[in-house]
Amino acid sequence: MPIIFVFLLFLFIPFKDVYSNDEYFRTLRNDKVNLRQGPSFDYPIKIFYKKKFLPVLIQDSSENFRKIRDHENNTGWVHISQLSKKKAAIVIEEQLIMFSSATLYSNPVAKLKEGRLVTIRKCKNDWCKVETGEYKGWLKKSGLWGLL
């Protein structure tokens, strides 16, 4: 009987979520988010983010805090209530051309400068369909930070 219980216990525990050290991306939920030196409200604030949906890489966790790294390699801790699953990315090339379709042979829509925040709608192979301001189109994944 104990062997069956142990087997059932292992069957229903989501090991990937509980024991994983895999890094993954999230975005900042609010316009104002504090990056702290440690995983508690008792630690001092290192950086004060003022950009909603800024993508961050989750590197570690401690109770209700997540250790993050941003596109400028700043690291620190934020409370989980300040993170969102909404997908976004930052343009990391000096200029990135947005196309009307997921091919270099389609019409160019816009030139985006480095640092531009884009909302990800979907990704297909090496391309992502994005929105930013009044522009909608496709960007090469290689020019974006915030995707795995």
Which residues are covered by each model-predicted region?
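SH3-family beta-barrel domains
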Residues: 17-37, 47-52, 59-101, 105-134, ...
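Sec-dependent N-terminal signal peptides
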Residues: 3-14
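Second-shell loop/turn segments in exported
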Residues: 40-43
